[in-house]
């Protein structure tokens, strides 16, 4: 069976997924571009395309609000199944409209969605047009199901898929011992009795500013580590303002190191103001960590049983 996927960039978790799917079918993946802006290039360096054919419409960085008409060629090209993953990027948007005009059936796979009840009428109608015309949907959560139905999908056409960056071998069968945890803390030069970590880009949407504000009076025997890049002046100023010597900013880490950070920690906090999924929740839970996140994180809403394996808090 010939399957053609359309997606934005070669995110490592997508490459892993496509390599597995390519074992089951004749898979071709059309990427809009090679990279996204403001993402460390090391993120892509372990990508290995093995079991599928890759096509890049553009070299370099993706331009979400420009149309690359090269995509239309691959909408018309013969295959058994068309699958789209983005309805909000202009290039895939025009491809979805083109598929509709050609009366081609297609599957819409989305990672998540948050309903915008206050959006203007034109934007809402465009979303409904783009979402409602799929012949089938792949959704990772109940919240995403609600999103799809709100924008015109028929509930009986929605199918569940597991959205993750993990292989089964990555998941701990049991939590590591205190001895192993302490060895990791020694390896990473961590002197604290308890450790809280968070992972993500230093951008307002990730909510690190209000997390720092919330933890400014935390006991100094608790170490707080935010991992994911170079902090902007705003976050450095907050650290100085609150005299938080126990707050540390850690640069980009590869997968092996990230897994070690999860294992050595006592708590994972993800204070996002909006994430249509949030794969770090899957990752933290796979290493036995309790998680605190907000009601604007779809993976948290799907995976956390409040008070059992973590807590959902109301976004600021």
Task: Identify the function of each model-found stretch.
Residues 90, 104-122, 133-136, 140, ...:
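A short, histidine- and acid-enriched strand-loop-helix "catalytic/donor-clamping" loop
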